[in-house]
């Protein structure tokens, strides 16, 4: 048996969180945020307003240490999400790892737009490949 290769400090990590319902959503997102805060990593939360409110209620005063963005506003123009939300936050913290939760506001989008959303996820991998970022992308399996 061989040991896993060590992770590079500046490695971009992009896990998905597939969830059903509020309990699973909070179980996957809140610890991600708190773990980052515990080790001194800047954290940004860019999710639709309804989910933003859920997480804020769980975080309590920890929310004061998180960059909060409502993706129903910040993500209205998909072409601006990478440069104005994701990359901007990463670039604002050039030394050390940052954490981002980025959830696209899927609800209300027609099925024909799904391929563009999938392409956007792939572009995120390219746009942040040179940054020390852990980006969690939640997907509500009942809506996607």
Predicted regions and their residues:
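Non-catalytic regulatory/interaction regions at protein termini and inter-domain linkers
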Residues: 1-144
């Amino acid at each position: 048996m061989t040991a896993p290769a060590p992770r590079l400090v500046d490695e971009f990590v992009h896990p998905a969180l597939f969830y059903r319902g509020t309990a699973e959503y909070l179980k996957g997102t809140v610890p991600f945020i708190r773990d980052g805060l515990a080790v001194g990593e800047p954290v940004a939360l860019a999710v639709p307003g309804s989910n933003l409110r859920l997480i804020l209620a769980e975080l309590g005063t920890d929310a004061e240490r998180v960059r909060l963005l409502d993706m129903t506003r910040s993500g209205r123009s998909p072409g601006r999400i990478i440069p104005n939300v994701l990359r901007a936050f990463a670039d604002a913290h050039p030394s050390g790892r940052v954490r981002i939760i980025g959830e696209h506001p899927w609800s209300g989008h027609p099925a024909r737009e799904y391929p563009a959303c999938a392409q956007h996820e792939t572009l995120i991998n390219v746009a942040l490949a040179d940054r020390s970022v852990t980006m969690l992308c939640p997907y509500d399996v009942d809506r996607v």
